[in-house]
Amino acid sequence: MNGVEVPAKIQKRIERLRQEINDHNYRYYVLSQPTIPDSVYDELFHELQKLEKKYPETITPSSPTQRVGAEPLKVFEPVHHEIPMLSLDNVFDEKGLRAFDKRIRQRLKLDKPFEYVCEPKMDGVALSLLYENGELIRAATRGDGYTGENVTQNTRTIASVPLQLRGNDYPELVEIRGEVLMPREGFAKFNREAEKRGDKTFANPRNAASGSLRQLDPRITAKRPLIFYGYLIGLLKGKDFPKNHCDVLKWFKDWGIPVISEIKVVGGIEGCLDYYEHLVKTREKMPFDIDGIVIKVNSLQVQAELGFVSRAPRWAIAYKFPAQEKMTVVKAIEFQVGRTGAVTPVARLEPVSVSGVTVSNATLHNFDELYRKDVRVGDTVIVRRAGDVIPEVVGPILAKRPKKAKLIKIPSRCPVCHAEVIKPEGEAVARCVGGLYCRAQLRESIKHFASRRALDIEGLGDKLVELFIQEKLIKDITGIYQLKKSAITALPRMGEKSAENLLTAIEKSKKTTLPRFLYALGIRGVGDTTARTLARHFHELDLLMKASIETLQEIRDIGPVAAENIHAFFHQKHNAELINKLIHLGVHWPQEKAVVKSEIAGKTFVLTGALKSLTREEAEEKIERSGGKATSSVSKNTDYVIVGENPGSKYEKAKALGISLIDEEAFLKLLKSKGVF
């Protein structure tokens, strides 16, 4: 009230109301033990709103009334995950689960069973909540695991997410990871009301949760019945990790973070199997969709020892429920061509609803599968959503097969570019050999070429790529570097500023590195790690392009299949011409230096926190060029952890495991002393 002091009695009442509302939220969402009816809760909330409106100087960011009110966003800002938000590996039967347990015990050299934590696998949207001194400062989606989207404004509208952690025993900085869900009851009610208004409905609760969280206007998200459950800690600063994962979940409850009540600590894999059988029988009684169980090693020390492999932890697995199945008819079998030339048969089906999703197309995986299952046009088939996600054809019902059911043959020519289709002996996949020249492979090739780990062309997204191809502005990947401002501004929703920004990003991408360029080419089986291996070995692109299969096979980590793929790619005339044209258009990179023998060679490094002089990717590239290996997670196999500003939980894990810690200055000295920097 413009300089008028707030009466002490009013200030006290406001603080009391906030405390009561937060306590009732805690009892409702965390304890599932509400003590007042909704009408009384609403009265308390409205009283607080009125007082804060009258005395706006009393409003704080963590007040329960401040969940909604921000202006709509124009775009979601990207968020880099200090610790990658990795997905889990899946198993679909008891054999797979026992193999997971066996791998762990062999790695740890243990014969006896040990503790696991079992929990329902929620079918929602992964979310990261970052709290500083107990206050929610950021919420981000998983994205690709490394970069997500900032959805803080929308997340603040979810009533089960505390804006301020309870108590005072929380760390200086903590990242709480979990899942955003839309309960079945809320989903059904939302769709009923949407139908009445003539608005779009959602196919299933997961799509509804995802769509609600990614609304640019938080006022829309606020109207959606979303709930959050925590299940993991990411970053942690100012507090030591507890002994076990179940202790982390107790922290969450104490701080006011909802945790699923069906979580159970079990002894050995037999306990996991019992838990799975119990949840199979009771899953429909749960208020939200689940699609399996998640099994985690309970000991955090053992988790750190096991570490990660590829994009998943070794210490956790998802055991999926059997997929739901329905019958329908195959109307046609068509062919799709992927980025690496794989020609995949796809069944076009009479639309059928499976697990709440309308399915009209289903993968047949490859021609070996097609013939093994003996699926024909006209067949009545069983369709299921594999892992409750990807639709696939299980097989035909032979008793219903019509006399004119048509068997499909492998095409001899690509249905798009008419290049030869080959199916090597012993391989299940048939492939178009057209490479970068194939128009069907063009769209995915361009998206891959422009991706963050490749040439990193900011602003060249999926929709824009589609538009450029549709308007015939890009006929192959070299077309990216021949785009004109006048042609771009002539397109819908592309003004001068947008065109200038895109052209600037394209120009910037011309200066790259050999590993990035090799990865960008999309050679089958050549990921960013293999690309770095090839660049370190050959140093020059010309030498790599001329290498024989035998020479390639001599390189560590390059097997016979990868060697054949690399050799075949560079010996396709179209591919060689496109590479030369890209170089002629200005794509260039510094010559790769030979790996110098140093303290870095043969060592495994992990980075945590922000470096002042280098980006994370630049630091990783320099480590690789020096013969070292850069990984994203700390394990007992890590040699050094490079500690930057505001280090995360990797720092704490490294200390616990006794791993050598070096700061940025020491790391730079290592590089400079060997002429790498």
Swiss-Prot record:
For this chain's UniProt record, which GO biological process terms are given?
A: DNA repair; DNA replication
CDD domains per record: BRCT_DNA_ligase_like, LIGANc
A GO molecular function annotation here is: DNA ligase (NAD+) activity
Q: Which cofactor does it need?
A: Mg(2+); Mn(2+)
Q: Which reaction does it catalyse?
A: NAD(+) + (deoxyribonucleotide)n-3'-hydroxyl + 5'-phospho-(deoxyribonucleotide)m = (deoxyribonucleotide)n+m + AMP + beta-nicotinamide D-nucleotide
Q: What is its EC number?
A: 6.5.1.2
Question: Which intervals of the chain form a coiled coil?
Answer: none
Assigned GO CC terms: cytosol
Binding-site list for NAD(+):
38-42, 87-88, 119, 142, 179, 296, 320
Residues the record lists as binding Zn(2+): 414, 417, 432, 438
Q: What family is it from?
A: Belongs to the NAD-dependent DNA ligase family. LigA subfamily.
Q: What does this protein do?
A: DNA ligase that catalyzes the formation of phosphodiester linkages between 5'-phosphoryl and 3'-hydroxyl groups in double-stranded DNA using NAD as a coenzyme and as the energy source for the reaction. It is essential for DNA replication and repair of damaged DNA.
Q: What is this protein called?
A: DNA ligase
| Highest classification ranks of the organism | Bacteria, Pseudomonadati, Pseudomonadota, Gammaproteobacteria, Legionellales
